[in-house]
Amino acid sequence: MNKNILLRIAKVAFLLFLMIGTALIIRNNRNKVQQSQTEWTTNEGKVFGTPYHITYHSTQDMHDSILVALAQVDSSLSMFNPESQVAKINSNETDVMNPQLKHLLAQSLEISQKTDGAFDVTVAPLVNAWGFGFKNAESVSQAQIDSIMQFVGYDKISIIGDKLEKKDPRTMLDFSAIAKGYGVDQAAAVLERNGITDYMVEIGGEM
């Protein structure tokens, strides 16, 4: 057979090989993109009075399990849920803490000691006085602040067994500084327990 003909056949075969190979690569990548897009799940809602957005790489919808975890945090720490553990402690309906609240309060008191009170969960009366909490206020005087400070301070409370002991019944707790971040941790823990490692959890700006 003529060498020129053989050369042309070889070129055509090579071009066909390239075209088929390229088509297979494109199709494979397209399938991967489509598969990746269908494997992302998004859950949204509200907790602690603020929106949350959770996205994770899984076809398994974990929203129900996440809601259970967030509800537990809400029932322990929410200032805006009158049935929460912290709300009942603030209103002196009870002095008994559930394990979750006790654990977080113990950690909070440790941080308060290390920061010399820069972080303090007993600021609820001040927060309310300034209108940033669950009560509204138009203005606050220095005299009011001085009066409130008489029962604000981490040294005004202590943990005795499963109970919270207050030196003054007007002392109230506010976990707003850590509640959302703790909620993020609990939602993330649900995902990781189910083998999901690619995710983003955002609650009220905390991630």
Language-model segments: residues:
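FAD-binding core of FAD-dependent oxidoreductases
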Residues: 200-207
